[in-house]
Structures are given as C-alpha cells and as structure tokens.
Design a protein with these regions (language model features):
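Structural hallmark of WD40 beta-propellers
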Residues: 77-81, 121-125, 134-135, 143-145, ...
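WD40/WD-repeat beta-propeller blade N-cap
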Residues: 61-68, 105-113, 147-154, 182, ...
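Conserved strand-to-loop turn within each blade of WD40 beta-propeller repeats
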Residues: 83-86, 126-130, 162, 168-172, ...
Length: 348
C-alpha cells in the first residue's frame, strides 16, 4: 500500500465524522527502510498461499525456533537482539549492505520475554519466565551472569542511562531497580497489579498494569508514584510508548485501539484515541508501539500482521504497509531510525 491519508479521529469527533480525510504529508515520512524481520520457524505446508514477506523486508537467519517476544537494537551500533519463547537470546549484526550476520546467543531455562541494552551498547539484559535477570557482556565475549531476579516472570526491562540503573517489571507486582555492582536490587517498588508494559523517556517512566492502570514515575524521585492514570482504553493493556518529550505516553490494547495521553492535567484536551489493526468486524491486538528516534512519528504493529506509521501531532496515518499473513509480535527502530525491525510468528 502507499500513503494512507486517513485521519485519526479524536475522542471529540470520533462518532461525528468517522470518515474524515486530510491530505497526506510525505515530508513527515522518515527514511524507514530497510525493515528487518526475525521470523519464527514454521511449517511451509501449513502457511497457505499467502506471501510470507509482502513488503520484501530483509530476513535474519537463522530464525528463532519459536515466537519472538522482544526486539532491541544497540544504542551504538546496528546489533539486533531478539528474545524468544524457545528460551534463547540471539544477536545479529545488520551490515551496511543489509545482510544480517548471526553473532552470538545465550540461553535461559524458560521462555525469554524481554530485553534491553546498557547505554554504551556493550551489555545485554534479558528476563523471562525463569524469573532471572541475565546480564550478558556481549561485546567483550564474556559469559552471562544472573541478578537475583523476581518471584514471578519478568515482563519488561529498561536501562536508565542517567542513573546507571536497570529497571525490571514483573508479574510479581513489583518494579526492581538494579545497580549492576550488586546482585540484589537497589530498590523494590510495589505495583497495584502485574506489570504488563513499561516505557521510559527519562525522567518519565510509564508502567502499564493488569488492572488497566498506567503508573507514572518521575525517576528523579523513583520511590514515589508521580501519578496513577486509568487507561483511556476499555480493555487489557498490551504496550506503551513514552513520548520523546516526556509529556505523555501512547497505550495500545487488545481491542485494536491506541490512546494518546498527556500526563499534565492542563493538557487533557489534547488526549484522544483511535482505532487501528482492524478489518471489518475483525479486531486485532496492538502488540507494539515505537517512536522514531529522530522524527518522533511512531509505529504500531499488531496481530493482523500489519504495521503502520503515524503522526500524533497532525493526527495522520503516514504509511500503511502490506499485511503479513501472521501476527507481528514486536517491533523496534534502530538508534538513528534508519531501520525498523519487526517479528512475525507462524503457527507450527
């Protein structure tokens, strides 16, 4: 598909003018190509006639053996990490010509759900169903070491560069802050419910919980909640993305809808929600939200196999890509926004 000028309807006009259109703005389209896609292995005989790669994206090999749960690019180089339900953490180097070279991998005892890099791109962190945070000094070739972890699976990780700390969010209803010089957490923050999503734009930390709350922390005072916000969406939170200017966040849910929400009460008139990843009466989960690091437009990816680029300020969909035949489980941009990586999962 080409540029889709469909306007994102605001809460105010959503029912009054659901088919409003405005002209596209190609100047806001960042250089998103190439797209890289780790792809879980699948039975080709069961895949049907649908084109498994309709956007002609580059594919990494060897592919993970099960669903990809997270993707993370190094902040310093085009090194891509994928975590997977096959208990593996894999790294590829995306070379200038577009080739993807497998570099290294490590294992967990159970499925891995999340990943993050440290600020200088030397170390990878991973966590998952074995309840352990692993610290992998990838660039030095060292062996991973384990932090003490959580009492339930670890769903989210983020590196807080100004503080030199790692934060992990778990289904044990806690956030834990880690000083890498010690195995025990520097601070344990209680949450009202299980952590389902987390996004960081320092000093803003947004945490989505199982009760549809979004907990806002000002990391200049991390031991106290700054604000607790009820999600503007009616159903379970799947993903979050903090605004690059720290003024708010995007929230995506299982109902095929995204909320654009500001933290400051004075900006509540700017809040709106919009529908996406729907086809007729079929509604698909929004699985991933990513801001472009330069242009601050954003991407959504969903269980309909589609990914789209949007501009929240002009309320435009900038580009809709051809849908893959299977769900997209996660996605991310590289450090300068020149590469967009996404993972699709085929049923065995």
């Amino acid at each position: 598909m080409g540029v889709d000028p469909t306007r994102l309807p605001s809460l105010k006009n959503q029912n009054q003018n659901p088919n409003a259109h405005i002209a596209p703005n190609p100047a806001r389209l960042p250089p998103f190509l190439p797209q890289i896609r780790p792809m879980a292995s699948f039975n080709a005989a069961g895949a049907g006639a649908a084109n498994p790669n309709p956007n002609k994206s580059l594919e990494v090999n060897p592919a993970p053996g099960d669903a990809v749960s997270s993707l993370s690019f190094s902040p310093k180089a085009n090194h891509l990490i994928a975590t997977s339900w096959d208990n593996q953490v894999r790294c590829w180097e995306v070379q200038p010509g577009g080739q993807c070279q497998a570099k290294a991998s490590i294992s967990h005892d159970q499925p891995v759900l999340c990943s993050a890099w440290n600020g200088d791109g030397t170390t990878v962190f991973s966590g998952g169903c074995d309840k352990v945070v692993k610290m992998w000094p990838l660039l030095s070739g060292g062996q991973p070491t384990a932090l003490s972890g959580h009492e339930a699976p670890i769903k989210e990780l983020a590196w807080i560069q100004p503080m030199g700390l790692l934060v992990s969010g778990s289904w044990d209803k806690t956030l834990r802050y880690w000083d890498l010089r010690q195995a025990q957490p520097a601070h344990v923050q209680q949450l009202p419910e299980r952590c389902y999503a987390l996004s960081l734009s320092y000093p803003l930390l947004a945490v989505g919980t199982a009760d549809r709350n979004v907990i806002i922390f000002n990391l200049q005072n991390p031991q106290a909640e700054f604000k607790r916000i009820q999600s503007p969406l009616k159903y379970q939170t799947r993903c979050l993305a903090a605004f690059p200017d720290q003024s708010g966040f995007l929230v995506g849910s299982i109902e095929g809808r995204v909320g654009v929400h500001h933290v400051d009460d004075a900006n509540q008139s700017k809040n709106f929600t919009f529908k996406c990843h729907r086809e007729g009466n079929d509604i698909y989960s929004v699985n991933s939200l990513n801001f472009h690091p330069v242009h601050h437009t954003f991407a959504t990816a969903g269980s309909d196999g589609g990914f789209n680029f949007w501009d929240k300020d002009s309320k435009q969909r900038l580009k809709a890509f051809s849908k893959c035949p299977s769900p997209i489980t996660c996605s991310t941009f590289n450090q300068d926004g020149s590469i967009f990586a996404y993972a699709i999962t085929f049923n065995h």
